[in-house]
Amino acid sequence: MSALDNRLFAKMNGIGNEIVVVDLRDQPAPVTPADARAVAAHVPYDQLMLLQPARLSGTEAFVRIYNNDGSESGACGNGMRCVARQMFSGSEKNGLTFETRAGLLNCWRGPADGLYTVDMGEPKFGWQDIPLAEEFRDTRMIELQIGPIDAPVLHTPSVVSMGNPHAIFWVDDVNAYDLGRFGPLLENHPIFPERANITLAHIVDRQHITMRTWERGAGLTKACGSAACSTAVAAARLKRTDRTVEMTLPGGQLTIEWRESDNHVLMTGGAAFEFEGRFDPALFSGALDPTGA
């Protein structure tokens, strides 16, 4: 028996990042990695956002985040905007606080209808915090490349943690590389003991960046909020952009502000509802064929 048996779920997306949200605040029983993989086989998603009973006073819920391969993630900005949209529906509150593995996240209604802002917290730059498998005194750009030594295909990424590890490769054209091929190689590179999210980014000007991401545990994605935050922060660290930038992702636009007053990163963007459903218990007992045959 699974904690997800017969549970109502909402299928949503955050500018193309496929999200499933399930409210389990009345259900303390754990959801397993096998459960998360079973859901992905029938309701394809990038992240599964599970609202579990609040652990801390003043928070709405503890949000557990699964990738579609059954691994857990500490943060998912696009998913948190979807959670915020669901929780703000029918509520008069203007702000909500959630607990995640990465810490507390605050969410607000955005500057316009359909937009939501998430405070993603402070970025981390120390090699142990990202983490990396070996010491780098300066993580603004590290020695890492893929391809021939004298003509690398991708090289010298910036590395940042926004609750999960990110590597950003600076390129002239984000569509000129086979990220579906290089992404898994770099995600699983030995330098990243917890694997990493891999982003290709092009700085258009001081207020605009375009990017594509191979998401750890999920693969190619139309949008990754924590990657957008990491990319914006990494560019600002290199003095190549301002601290507020517009990010263009395959799925749409995000506004990222790296706030100077407290070092927090704010992400603003949309969240769309697609449909609701209930999980068939047979999904978790193995009675349903994942192929649909």
Curated annotation (Swiss-Prot):
The lineage of its organism: Bacteria, Pseudomonadati, Pseudomonadota, Alphaproteobacteria, Hyphomicrobiales. Belongs to the diaminopimelate epimerase family. Substrate binds at residues 17, 47, 67, 77-78, 164, 197, 215-216, 225-226. It holds the Pfam family DAP_epimerase. InterPro entries: DAP_epimerase_AS, DAP_epimerase_DapF. The gene is dapF. The keyword Amino-acid biosynthesis applies. It comes from Rhodopseudomonas palustris (strain ATCC BAA-98 / CGA009). Keywords: Amino-acid biosynthesis, Cytoplasm, Isomerase, Lysine biosynthesis. This is Diaminopimelate epimerase. One of its GO terms (cellular component) is cytosol.
